[in-house]
């Protein structure tokens, strides 16, 4: 099936099969599809609604084309990642949570990009923190193995995605490519916390991850519209564990955290995001820092739990709070910045 035939199917509201979608995705990754065709595909799938088979097939092909890092032998290897597109411009919760999860004894291989629809993507924030992302594959692997936390800058690993970059930028809508980012970690990760931009995606994304061989996954979307676990509202969760998917709703009070509004947690840019995160992870916090710390604990707890460090989510949230208030997460951030600086200097010598 060529992309024109696929578009014809999609306009009739017909889902593509996995083999059909794999063929279309390969044509995009090999530079055979025009930008107009890619843009039309993005819009058509968005209007129709991406099926589980379409997402699974596209993710499988994208993984096939990825430049990989093999750290799959590491125990407790996890990624915490969001689709973006919640439009609320909160501080970068998942990136802050990464340092807490790593300080808890899990290993983070975080797959991220610059902000597409938000003001602070993970890469924007990390660069502000002095963490170098322009590392080669061996250096990134060293960060993961030696520091317990490494960041996989998506364009370095998914070079074939350059063909979709123009349409994504020009259309400015969330699309199947926003969904694929969290599904295509190039480090062989099988444990994930994935935030999605609609609660209707929670179960389907869990189903996709099951087909892709994941072991333990929490797919989350909060009732106030966040692609993460919210401090201000219940969060819908689809959890894949031991091959089974269960759906449940989480209230912060369920794990001993008082619900609060998100006032004060919105940031203008990566600089403001970093300032708030450093406040939240420090031992002496402002009132807004305390609130941000609670938000981080809810999300870091999910990562600690799916990584297999604790048996329950509630235990993991309590552990995350201990780490945040003990200052270990902030220390992990500064140590990683220093380590990447050393790697870059040795590269230059």
UniProtKB/Swiss-Prot annotation:
Pathway: Amino-acid biosynthesis; L-tryptophan biosynthesis; L-tryptophan from chorismate: step 2/5. Mg(2+) 2 binds at residues 227-228. Binds 2 magnesium ions per monomer. Anthranilate 2 binds at residue 168. Its cofactor is Mg(2+). It holds the Pfam family Glycos_transf_3. Keywords: Amino-acid biosynthesis, Aromatic amino acid biosynthesis, Glycosyltransferase, Magnesium, Metal-binding, Transferase, Tryptophan biosynthesis. One of its GO terms (molecular function) is anthranilate phosphoribosyltransferase activity. Its EC number is 2.4.2.18. It is an enzyme of class 2 (transferase). One of its GO terms (biological process) is L-tryptophan biosynthetic process. 5-phospho-alpha-D-ribose 1-diphosphate binds at residues 82, 85-86, 92-95, 110-118, 122. One of its GO terms (cellular component) is cytosol. Mg(2+) 1 binds at residues 94, 228. Anthranilate 1 binds at residues 82, 113. InterPro entries: Anthranilate_Pribosyl_Tfrase, Glycosyl_Trfase_fam3, Glycosyl_Trfase_fam3_N_dom, Glycosyl_Trfase_fam3_N_dom_sf, Nuc_phospho_transferase. It catalyses: N-(5-phospho-beta-D-ribosyl)anthranilate + diphosphate = 5-phospho-alpha-D-ribose 1-diphosphate + anthranilate. HAMAP family: TrpD. Belongs to the anthranilate phosphoribosyltransferase family. Catalyzes the transfer of the phosphoribosyl group of 5-phosphorylribose-1-pyrophosphate (PRPP) to anthranilate to yield N-(5'-phosphoribosyl)-anthranilate (PRA). Homodimer. This is Anthranilate phosphoribosyltransferase. The lineage of its organism: Bacteria, Pseudomonadati, Pseudomonadota, Gammaproteobacteria, Moraxellales.
